[in-house]
Amino acid sequence: MVRAWRILQEETDDPRDALYSDESVSLEQLAQVGVEYFKFDADTFEQNDDYLKLKNNRGYSYSDTISVSRATLPDFDAKIKSFFEEHLHTDDEIRFILDGSGYFDVRDLDGRQLRDCWIRIECVKGDLLVLPSGIYHRFTLDKKDYIKALRLFIGVPVWTPHNRPADSMKERLDYVSKYLTATT
């Protein structure tokens, strides 16, 4: 089962630190900010009916695999730094963790949006996360410095980060309308 918690203080020299707090976040709370979570066996998912149904029902027609480590990713330090810049995408970001681990941080909306607090989601082998288009987020590895993920896309893959501020983008406005104003 996925573990998630609010980051109450970010004072660290290393974003790969867990930054644990005692404010855990449930799947229901993740859903309130638009994040969806699924669990599949990463070794047999291609034969899993529930995974295939999810993929087909949502139109995930393209996938590729990314391996993030010092040995596999050219310009590793610069890439990791760019992944950790707060950004959004115009499409959903769908990641299925095949091996390794890391953290997705998404903006908290529990009255803390204005204080720029984060929810940290620990991603491990078998976790499939869907981050909705328009959500501000960032990614970092954990101290193991390795993750391998299947990236799923609808149609032609587009992975263009739009760094904050991007509040006037249609996708951000749609996200705010659907998730943030619905709870205030």
Swiss-Prot record:
Catalytic activity: 1,2-dihydroxy-5-(methylsulfanyl)pent-1-en-3-one + O2 = 4-methylsulfanyl-2-oxobutanoate + formate + 2 H(+); 1,2-dihydroxy-5-(methylsulfanyl)pent-1-en-3-one + O2 = 3-(methylsulfanyl)propanoate + CO + formate + 2 H(+)
Known cofactor(s): Fe(2+); Ni(2+)
Annotated keywords: Amino-acid biosynthesis, Cytoplasm, Dioxygenase, Iron, Metal-binding, Methionine biosynthesis, Nickel, Nucleus, Oxidoreductase
SUPFAM superfamilies the UniProt entry points to: RmlC-like cupins (SSF51182)
Cofactor annotation remark: Binds either 1 Fe or Ni cation per monomer. Iron-binding promotes an acireductone dioxygenase reaction producing 2-keto-4-methylthiobutyrate, while nickel-binding promotes an acireductone dioxygenase reaction producing 3-(methylsulfanyl)propanoate.
Highest rank taxon of the organism: Eukaryota
Family: Belongs to the acireductone dioxygenase (ARD) family.
Localization annotation: Cytoplasm; Nucleus
Any one GO CC term of the record: cytoplasm
A Pfam family matched in the record: ARD
Binding residue positions for Ni(2+): H87, H89, E93, H137
Broadest EC class assigned to this enzyme: oxidoreductase
A GO biological-process term: L-methionine salvage from methylthioadenosine
Signal peptide: none
Species, as recorded: Ciona intestinalis (Transparent sea squirt)
Pathway: Amino-acid biosynthesis; L-methionine biosynthesis via salvage pathway; L-methionine from S-methyl-5-thio-alpha-D-ribose 1-phosphate: step 5/6
Keyword Lyase belongs to the record: no
Protein name: Acireductone dioxygenase
Alphabetical list of InterPro entries matching this protein: ARD, ARD_euk, RmlC-like_jellyroll, RmlC_Cupin_sf
